Amino acid sequence: LLPNGESRTTSRDFADMVQSQIVGDLQMQFDSLWSRRSTWDRSYRESRTPSSPSMLLELLSHQNFADMKYGLDPSFRFAVSRAVYKGMLKYLSSRYGTAYVVQPLPVGSMGVSFSKDGNKAIISWKPACDPLEPTADPSGYILHTRVDDGAFDRGVKIKDIKRGNDRLYTEIDITPGHIYSFRVTAYNDGGRSFPSETISIGLPVTADLSEKILIVNNFDRVSAPAFVDTPIYAGFDNRIDSG
């Protein structure tokens, strides 16, 4: 029994809910044939002696090439980590009989530009919806600001949000002669998302607003290293793409 008198078989429910969440999410996002592997009931000290429900998770084998084609992909790792979090959350919801809300996904496609008079920065982003989890919709956004080499502030809830072209916008006053950096996080009753990428903007004291420069972040895609998979040999080739 657990210290509170509850049966340790609740750990079986815990493991089942986390595994079900992982398998379901991976089948939806990466491989519809992703198999559900065995759940063991073994006397491992790490999961047998804790004073709270516990489980051990072994998802991939570093000696399995098919596994590592996924395991080295950052987007796959994020999906698995989020699935573990959602499985834990749903277990706690079931155990205590309370509703749950999943934290939002990070916003994407961040952008910033000057207003026509140059006195404001126009910050824009695309909201991220989680098709696997309807409770993860954001209820609002928080703007974090840094001036020059200072630290980011603790964030301010954005009250004035405009919409257009599938994007959300807000404006903030800026002073020439300083560099402003911004991050946006989404929030709901389940918590805050991870922060967006950092975007920066600045206007010299003497500036010509008639000239414009467009800077595009073209490095927002992630992947595993390039691989070769033939009947003769298989493996990763970092010479082509290290991921």
What are these regions (language model features)?
Residues 1-6:
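A short, glycine/acidic-enriched catalytic loop
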Residues 7-40:
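Active-site-adjacent substrate-binding region
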Residues 30-96:
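Active-site-adjacent mobile loop/cap segments within catalytic or ligand-binding domains
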Residues 90-137, 176, 190-211:
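Pro/Thr/Ser/Gly-rich low-complexity, intrinsically disordered linker/stalk tracts
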Residues 164-170:
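Short S/T/G- and acidic-enriched coil/turn segments that sit immediately N-terminal to beta-strands
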Residues 170-192:
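Beta-strand-rich modules
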Residues 198-243:
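Aromatic-Pro/Gly-enriched surface loop or interdomain linker
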